[in-house]
């Protein structure tokens, strides 16, 4: 059963709000933790493409770019189904009889494009064994936090985030679904040269989408014409995607995602965190950030 059918199950908000459990120190929904053995033993294939991100780091945007490249800029083909059906999250687990990510992935014909928010040490080992290609997208911590906070407010399948001040503390401590942002971006960065991983930055994609789309196409070994490239840039722009029901999650009932609280595609602008953090919160966050990122050579931009 698809997500759109969830309203027919007459589930209340209390039924959707997940209980959480830790798996290897990472906070997950109880449904995911109960199915962890199946997730861990997922069988990847050599021609799989995996899009890996921390939550709210540009997952859907990257997915649309990849889909457009794979389909030579054919917009109709890229609107064949909703984003979560075209490229499922392998770990996302829903109450029966709804289709979970594993169900969708296992039914897909090859070649598959799949997604995950899992930290690197929790990626099913078959992806390494099969040498699948992986695109990782990282976004600066402050913008990621604000976006994740508003997403958690509107998405009834995520834990209640509380106030922004409370959420900042949860985020810093890694006590949010999928764990610590710091460990996530560093973990994937540390293995990027050992595997077929293209590591991208959200801010670079916003600054020069043409350059970054070319990088993705090269990684996918796809030749695209200038005409197709420009088409991809246009159709994957924030304003166009925001109006695309196959990408913006508006086909879901408000009992699952309430767009009146916050749209799924909210602003997408680097530096928007400045409209939400107080000076004291920003200074405290920066001090904690320096401690947690000490020794890493990753450079993030908090505005462009």
Swiss-Prot record:
Major localization listed first in the record, in broad terms: cytoplasm
InterPro entries (alphabetical): P-loop_NTPase (IPR027417), Sulfotransferase_dom (IPR000863)
GO biological process: 3'-phosphoadenosine 5'-phosphosulfate metabolic process; sulfation; sulfur compound metabolic process; xenobiotic metabolic process
GO cellular component annotations of the record: cytoplasm
Keyword Secreted: no
GO molecular function, one term: alcohol sulfotransferase activity
Record keywords: Cytoplasm, Transferase
Catalytic-site annotation from UniProt: 117 (proton acceptor)
Known role: Sulfotransferase that utilizes 3'-phospho-5'-adenylyl sulfate (PAPS) as sulfonate donor to catalyze the sulfate conjugation of drugs, xenobiotic compounds, hormones, and neurotransmitters. May be involved in the activation of carcinogenic hydroxylamines.
Protein name: Sulfotransferase 1C1
Origin species: Rattus norvegicus
Lineage: Eukaryota, Metazoa, Chordata, Craniata, Vertebrata
């Amino acid at each position: 059963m698809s997500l759109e059918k969830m309203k027919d199950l007459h589930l209340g908000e209390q039924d959707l709000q997940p209980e959480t459990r830790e798996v290897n120190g990472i906070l997950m929904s109880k449904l995911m933790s109960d199915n962890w053995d199946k997730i861990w033993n997922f069988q990847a294939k050599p021609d799989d493409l995996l899009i890996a991100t921390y939550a709210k780091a540009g997952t859907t945007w990257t997915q649309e770019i990849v889909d457009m490249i794979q389909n030579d800029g054919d917009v109709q083909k890229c609107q064949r189904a909703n984003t979560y059906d075209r490229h499922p999250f392998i770990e996302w687990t829903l109450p029966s009889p709804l289709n979970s990510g594993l169900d969708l992935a296992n039914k897909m014909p090859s070649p598959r494009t799949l997604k995950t928010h899992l930290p690197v040490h929790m990626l099913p080992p078959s992806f390494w064994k099969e040498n699948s290609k992986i695109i990782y997208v990282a976004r600066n911590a402050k913008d990621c936090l604000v976006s994740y906070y508003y997403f958690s407010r509107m998405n009834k399948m995520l834990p209640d985030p509380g106030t922004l001040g409370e959420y900042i503390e949860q985020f810093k401590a890694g006590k949010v679904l999928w764990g610590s942002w710091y460990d996530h971006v560093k973990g994937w960065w540390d293995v990027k040269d050992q595997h077929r991983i293209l590591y991208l930055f959200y801010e670079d994609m916003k600054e020069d989408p043409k350059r970054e789309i070319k990088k993705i196409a090269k990684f996918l070994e796809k030749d695209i014409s200038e005409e197709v490239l420009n088409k991809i840039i246009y159709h994957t722009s924030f304003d166009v995607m925001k109006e695309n029901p196959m990408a913006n999650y508006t086909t879901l009932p408000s009992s699952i995602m309430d767009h009146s609280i916050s749209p799924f595609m909210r602003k997408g602008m680097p530096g928007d965190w400045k409209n939400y953090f107080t000076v004291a919160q920003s200074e405290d966050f920066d001090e904690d950030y320096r401690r947690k990122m000490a020794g890493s050579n990753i450079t993030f931009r908090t505005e462009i």
